[in-house]
């Protein structure tokens, strides 16, 4: 392919992508009035679907303080923008972390009367319902955290500690009240945990034990009974079995390690976080969860935030800098290609809606309005588009596609394909990298190879090869990261990321 042909091909691909994006945006607007179907676990146990059987790719955004820290106009701007940027779900909190009980919201509302979980303030919960409905109008689901974890673990967190093992009915009452207010909304799923472990008992984690000890908890502390009551209250309030996840503290302790067999837990969650350095091997944690029985979907609910300072605890060294868009892409692509049912993006200024009124923590470097247009935040839609442009429910992780060592840390490559061997994706985090792929893992006499740019969402055809052989590839000299897309030519798939396959 000469340079003129390749240039024409790239222009054509970009034009089609632009038109397709406009169609998707218009579709979201025209269907906004329709109730969104609920989400459930797909029959394979690893992925998600809507109640009417359509694929659901979890592309989340952390908006933890949306209910507490935004005006109506700000919330509308946030929801509209994230809807237009291709997100499918936002994560927010009812009883939020930072003074969410004692400080009135941006609308002047407190969630509880006299700090009593048995006395919810109806006006505050009216606002919760409004946000859920406005999210639906923008094509968004809401992953609702009823209770941030510090309301169980304070003074590990600002608290106050409202829910204890000796007042379990309070947790069930509060969850029931909230769920009953939302029982007619299909666009709500539930997240328990709120950045805290469900227990200290049996956790071989010195940091968690030290945090628990400093807050006055014994080493065998177990908050699981409280979360069971929350889950029970949600189910009773809804009148149906809900989709529930668990959001643990940062680190390799996925909810699978201590909650996997809980009947109320639908999806495992983990938090690779912001304090462990670059290139945390989240792909290994996803693979561990993926192999567990019975199968449950899993995902990283809080990777390194864009523009978050690198490990600011206890004191930040500015020389270490911030996590930027490249750091975010490396983590989200590799976790999804390792078998996750999706992934959550986050921006350090957006989760708390940092501005002059709300303040900020941990060296926020910009206002949340500006942060809504940061590179990685806009680029996440390309990951979703890529996944949805090929058969959705058939994808399985397969590192055997990569011949030899897949690399470690910042050089780690991650591969995924479909069960029929009609396509494969390989994420490459570095430029000028030589690597080989076993095309024998795919079916087809001829295999078409393309480079997919995760910064622009544009795919470029490289060449076509005979099937059944090993082929060496070389990543482009600019980037820095790329996705190699391999397709059975006979499948006649569209260019990667351009249109939703079979939807």
Q: What is the meaning of each model-derived region?
A:
Residues 1-11:
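Bacterial N-terminal signal peptides that target proteins for export
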Residues 469-471:
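Short strand-edge motifs at loop-to-beta-strand transitions and within beta-strands
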Residues 59, 463-465:
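Short hydrophobic alpha-helix segments
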Residues 31, 54, 294-298, 305-308, ...:
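Aromatic- and carboxylate-lined catalytic core of secreted/periplasmic carbohydrate-active enzymes
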Residues 23-27, 33:
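Boundary at the C-terminal end of the N-terminal hydrophobic targeting segment
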Residues 9-21:
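Bacterial N-terminal signal peptides
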């Amino acid at each position: 392919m000469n340079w003129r042909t390749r240039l024409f091909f790239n222009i054509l691909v970009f034009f089609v992508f632009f038109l397709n994006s406009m169609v998707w945006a218009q579709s979201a607007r025209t269907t906004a009035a329709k109730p969104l179907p609920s989400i459930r676990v797909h029959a394979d146990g690893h992925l998600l679907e809507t109640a009417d059987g359509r694929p659901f790719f979890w592309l989340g955004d952390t908006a933890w303080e949306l209910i507490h820290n935004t005006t109506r106009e700000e919330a509308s701007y946030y929801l509209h923008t994230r809807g237009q940027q291709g997100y499918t779900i936002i994560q927010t909190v009812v009883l939020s972390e930072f003074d969410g009980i004692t400080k009135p919201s941006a609308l002047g509302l407190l969630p509880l009367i006299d700090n009593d979980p048995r006395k919810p303030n109806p006006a505050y919960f009216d606002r919760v319902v409004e946000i859920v409905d406005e999210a639906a109008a923008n094509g968004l689901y809401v992953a609702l955290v009823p209770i941030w974890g510090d309301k169980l673990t304070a003074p590990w967190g600002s608290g106050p500690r409202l829910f204890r093992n000796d007042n379990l009915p309070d947790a069930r009452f509060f969850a029931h009240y909230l769920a009953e207010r939302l029982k007619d909304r299909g666009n709500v799923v539930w997240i328990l945990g709120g950045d805290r472990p469900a227990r200290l008992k049996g956790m071989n984690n010195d940091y968690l034990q030290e945090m628990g000890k400093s807050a006055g908890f014994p080493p065998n502390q177990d908050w699981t009974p409280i979360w069971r009551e929350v889950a029970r209250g949600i189910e009773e309030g809804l009148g149906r079995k809900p989709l529930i996840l668990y959001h643990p503290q940062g680190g390799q302790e996925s909810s699978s390690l201590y909650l996997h067999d809980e009947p109320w837990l639908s999806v495992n969650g983990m938090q690779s976080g912001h304090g462990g350095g670059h290139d945390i091997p989240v792909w290994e944690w996803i693979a561990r969860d993926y192999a567990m029985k019975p199968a449950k979907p899993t995902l990283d609910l809080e990777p390194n935030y864009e523009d978050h300072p690198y490990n600011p605890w206890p004191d930040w060294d500015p020389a270490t800098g911030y996590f930027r868009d490249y750091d975010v892409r490396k983590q989200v692509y590799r976790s999804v290609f390792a078998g996750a049912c999706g992934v959550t993006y986050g921006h350090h200024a957006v989760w708390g809606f940092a501005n002059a009124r709300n303040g900020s923590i941990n060296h926020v470097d910009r206002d949340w309005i500006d942060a809504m247009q940061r590179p990685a935040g806009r680029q996440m839609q390309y990951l979703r588009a890529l996944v949805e442009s090929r058969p959705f429910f058939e994808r399985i992780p397969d590192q055997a596609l990569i011949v030899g060592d897949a690399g470690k840390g910042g050089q780690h490559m991650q591969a995924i394909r479909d069960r029929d061997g009609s396509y494969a994706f390989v994420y490459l985090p570095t430029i000028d990298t030589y690597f080989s792929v076993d095309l024998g893992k795919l079916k087809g006499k001829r295999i078409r190879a393309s480079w997919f740019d995760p910064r622009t969402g544009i795919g470029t055809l490289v060449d076509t090869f005979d099937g059944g052989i090993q082929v060496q590839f070389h990543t482009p000299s600019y980037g820095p990261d790329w996705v190699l897309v391999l397709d059975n030519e006979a499948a006649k798939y569209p260019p990667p990321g351009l249109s939703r396959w079979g939807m």
